[in-house]
């Protein structure tokens, strides 16, 4: 992936996350549930003052510091390894974008806007940035596991 494409991808992903969050805040009342696809997923506007699954509620400064450290480490690793694997770059782009997307909410609003509720499973309500983080971390784990086991592709 060319150097210029990386920041463009990060900004585009952050933009999508922030646009969805702004749309939800403008169009859905707090705690309102809208069945988007019945039985599959709903949109539910929540203000999450903790981490994933609403743990560590009201620990804003802890999350700000943790996010800065994680984004800093991911950026450093990306700069050092951007020429290695497209999959590695993609995983880091997702982690950085998701971290920054939720960081913007936490600093600007004091909470993170969550909205995606999976109706077919008992699971926490999450947002687009959380999806980026989850996919990015899982992809990174898979890449590192494959490297550790000598399966280079």
From Swiss-Prot:
Its main location: membrane. Keywords: Aspartyl protease, Cell membrane, Hydrolase, Membrane, Protease, Transmembrane, Transmembrane helix. One of its GO terms (cellular component) is plasma membrane. It is an enzyme of class 3 (hydrolase). Disulfide bonds: none annotated. It is found in: Cell membrane. Its EC number is 3.4.23.36. The chain crosses the membrane at residues 61-81, 85-105, 125-145. InterPro entries: Peptidase_A8. Pathway: Protein modification; lipoprotein biosynthesis (signal peptide cleavage). GO terms for molecular function: aspartic-type endopeptidase activity. It is a multi-pass membrane protein. HAMAP family: LspA. This protein specifically catalyzes the removal of signal peptides from prolipoproteins. This is Lipoprotein signal peptidase.
């Amino acid at each position: 992936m060319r150097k210029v494409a990386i920041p463009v991808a990060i900004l585009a992903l952050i933009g999508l996350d922030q646009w969805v969050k702004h749309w939800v805040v403008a169009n859905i009342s707090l705690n309102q549930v809208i069945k988007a696809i019945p039985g599959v997923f709903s949109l539910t506007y929540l203000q999450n003052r903790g981490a994933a699954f609403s743990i560590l509620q009201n620990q804003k400064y802890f999350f700000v510091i943790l996010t800065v450290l994680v984004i800093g480490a991911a950026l450093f690793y990306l700069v050092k390894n951007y020429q290695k694997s497209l999959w590695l770059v993609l995983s880091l782009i997702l982690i950085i974008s998701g971290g920054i997307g939720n960081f913007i909410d936490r600093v600007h609003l004091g909470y993170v806007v969550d909205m995606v509720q999976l109706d077919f499973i008992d699971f926490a309500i999450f947002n687009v940035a959380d999806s980026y983080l989850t996919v990015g971390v899982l992809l990174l784990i898979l890449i590192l596991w494959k490297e550790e086991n000598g399966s280079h592709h």
